[in-house]
C-alpha cells in the first residue's frame, strides 16, 4: 500500500497530537477559543424521520433513518424515495440504523440487531431514480449493542479501507480492553478482514479508549479526525493515530496524563454533543446535537473554532461535504430528544459566504 506524504497541515495536527500524549506535566486546559460566525441555509429536503447519516452514490444522496431502518435516495429537487430497508434492525434508544457508506457500487450499513451492532453491505442495484438494494452480506458482527453508546459512524479512508466507530455500550471497561470491539475505532478491508498493517497484529482495533465516537473524517494529507461524546465534563475532537489510547474511562478531555492521547479541542457537553464531522476546504466541520450548532475548526489551528447556526435549526446529527463542494447539515429533531418543527427533519445546504 502506498503511503501518503504528510503536508504542513497534517504534520501540524499530528505534532499537536504527539504533544498531547507526551506533555503530561501541564495542568488540564479549559474550553478552546471560540467565536461566532454568520451563515445562511437553504433547505434541500424535509420530512425525514430520525435521520442519521448521509452518503453519496456518485452524485446521488442517500440517507439512513435510524428508527425506520430505511435507506432513502434524493432527486435533484430534494424529493425522497425509499431504496429499501436494512432487515433485522432492532434498535431502541440510541440504536437502530446508524451510519452508511458507499464504495464500488455497494452500500455499507452499521445497524443494531438486538444485542449486537453489525456491519453489512448490499449491492446498489438499478439506476438513479429507481435504486434498489441487493441481498445482505455480513461484514462484521459482535459489536456490543445497548440503548446508549453504540458509536455507529462508518467511512472509507483514503487508504481504501473501511473505518467504524464503536461506543462502549455502557460497559466502560471495554474501551481499554483491546480484545473487545467496543469503545474503539476499527479498521478493516471492504470484506471485513484485518489489514496486515493494523497496529495490533490480527486485530481490527485501530485506536481505543473511546466512550462514544460518532464522527470520522480525513483531511487532504490523510490525517484522521474523530469527534467523541464525553460523559459530564468534556466532549472532544481527536486526531487519531494508529494504536493510540484516548483514555476513556481513565480520563476525559485534556488530562495531560502519560500514556493517553489528549484531544486537540474540548467543549462542555451543553455546547456540543458532537456527532458527524466533515473536512471541507481548510477546516473540520462538526455537527452538534445538544449544542444545536455547526462548529468549524481550522486545520492550521485546531485549538480555535467558529460556531454557526446556534439554536437556529435544533439538533444537528451529520455534516457532509458533497461531490460539488457544498456543505450539508442534517437535523435530528425527531430522534426523541429534540423539539421537531413541522418540516423536520431536514437537510440544509450551509453557505458561509465564501
Tell where the protein language model's regions lie, with residue ranges.
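Acidic, Gly/Ser/Thr-rich repeat motifs that build Ca2+-stabilized beta-propeller blades
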Residues: 25-171, 223-229, 271-306, 320-354
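Loop-centered beta-sheet repeat module
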Residues: 176-192, 196-221
